[in-house]
Amino acid sequence: MKVISRCDESPAGTAARATVTSRKFGFVAVTIMLAALVSVHSAFAARRHHAAAAAADASEENAASASNAALGAYSEACVLEPTTGTVIFESPNAHAPWPTASLAKMMLMLIVAEKIHDGSLKLTDNVTTSAKAAEMGGSQVYLKEGETFSLDDMMKAVVVHSANDASVAVAEYIAGSTDAFVVMMNQQAAAIGMKDSHYYSVHGLPPAKGQQADVASAYDQAILARELLKYPDVIRWSSIDTAPFRAGTFILRNTNHLVRTYPGCDGLKTGFYDKAGFNVVATAKRNDLRLIAVVLGSQHKLTNFKEASEMLSQGFLNYEIEQVAKKGAPITQSVALTDADTASIKPIWGGDAGVFVKRGGANNGIKVDYNLPPSVAAPVKAGQQIGTANVTAEGKSVATIALLAPSDVAKSSSMTKRLLSIF
């Protein structure tokens, strides 16, 4: 379903409009669903069907707005459970490339987060603003050439305020130039399986004459979001509502309204320019379940937030994580001890395990198989691995979790052994 652009502006005109607008503005899981997916997909689709039916009943004088409603509130969408990568809803064209606008910055976020994780970057690194960065238009924090901020502060400006000048400064700091950084972005996209995407900039601004727009499908944006969620710094940045910048003389305000209005929402990113429409990649967590919702090409500022929140709510209403194992809790079986004063020990779970299931399902085919030895010889150290447990659901392996000794077990003394032999 194709969104209708407000007008076919020139790149310069679009950029000018974008400038004005932007300144205003651990569980392991597996899917158990066949019929379940169909039913929830139908629930998502039903909302769009009812919207189209309502549009058909509209009067002629409201024909234009009714036509827009019939076309749908967005161009494409996708809802994904990140632990398993399960798609629980996608629009028919969820794999079609779509202009990213500032969602392009999500790839910058991923590269930065990975480099912080592997130690090649530090949050305390000083990033200096180049002349090119200082000249950036659109959403910005008005960096001056030569001005220096920590990488952490620059990333807050990128993620919270969608600052184009900070994006350029960070990209240049990492790769030496924005062109070199764009190469890194496309390499990373290919590495994580984004097949319907291509980046031409580090910021996602409307392309100038002769340039091409950054594009990614709704599904690819969900894949990217899934990768981002592996890094705590990303959620720390994207969950910020407001934050001071430049010693409090500038206040960053999150462009993602859902951080303020949707319970459990803590990210991730928004993007807009005329031909891209309003884009949002949102994530929320309730209890043990996290979901990602991508809505691209909305024609009205708040429509994308409304659609994303409704999609998330449908997901939370229909699915849950069924806990199978909790780290530190004892399992139901015991293991015999030899050369010890006690007869046996009951191993504990070495990690958490859960299964992504349809709410209200039967037992969802969940099974736990313990792999334990007949006995273990003392001494035993607390945390020592005793065996493993394999969690399956409908015959598919969900996780293999280590089973650990809950405490130290000393070897029996010679006197104890003699007494035991007597009795």
Q: What are these model-derived regions, one by one?
A:
Residues 29-37:
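Bacterial N-terminal signal peptides
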Residues 40-45:
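Sec/Tat signal peptide C-region and signal peptidase I cleavage site
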Residues 46-223, 228-232:
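Active-site-adjacent loops and short helices of periplasmic peptidoglycan-processing enzymes
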Residues 212-423:
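Domain-terminus/edge residues, biased toward the C-terminal soluble/receptor-binding domains
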